[in-house]
Amino acid sequence: MIMKKSILTVLFALICTMGFSQVSFNVKAGLNLSSYIGENSDHSEFKPGARIGVGMEYQFNDMISLQPSLFFSQRGAKYSSGFDGNIIDADADVKINQLYLELPVNVQFRFNIADNTNLVIATGPYLACGVGGKAKFDGDASVGGIHINGDDKIDTFGDDGLDYNRSDAGWNIGLGVEFGKILVGLDTQLGFCKVMDGDAPHNANIGITLGYKF
């Protein structure tokens, strides 16, 4: 609730100052390397995924801007066969795919480092909603007390699957370089919400993106 109020406050301030801001748009695509952190995240491995989205940037001056974006993002984690834990108990390789719509709202600080080249530092909250995904098991396994036998795929979200929590929220920190209209960035996201009820881990992600500013 606090996170939602903070984002609404930021968006309200944005609307009030739009008349004094320079507005631009961008598209971005890239690679995620996601896993879990926190409770029972031992032995979780990075899983690659894609990320694609659009953003708007409200530039208040040459240094400071606000950038809300909307991404379709593939996250999750992998576990190797033979792992025995409180959440994951696997005699098989496990790959958990979580597909999200993400809304990050970043404050950006821009520093000119060369002709037509800027260093950009960004930070801010994000909200995410799980919209799909499958968990794949190459053998017998148990996730959160749900048992799967043999080679199978089940839904990551929903009562008929792993029953992962759809809602996620967290904090984003990024570093990028602007070469004119070309954007290259590296960021990390740390989730505040557990992926499922109980003693479950949180989402963690490292992202690499390439974008273009209009």
Task: Specify the residue positions occupied by each region the protein language model found.
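Residues that define the transmembrane beta-barrel architecture of outer-membrane proteins
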Residues: 44-50, 97-103, 117, 167-171, ...
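Extracellular/periplasm-exposed beta-strand and loop segments of Gram-negative cell-envelope proteins
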Residues: 36-45, 75-100, 130-168, 172
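Outer-membrane beta-barrel channels and translocator barrels
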Residues: 20, 61, 73, 112-116, ...
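Bacterial Sec-dependent N-terminal signal peptides
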Residues: 1-28, 210-214
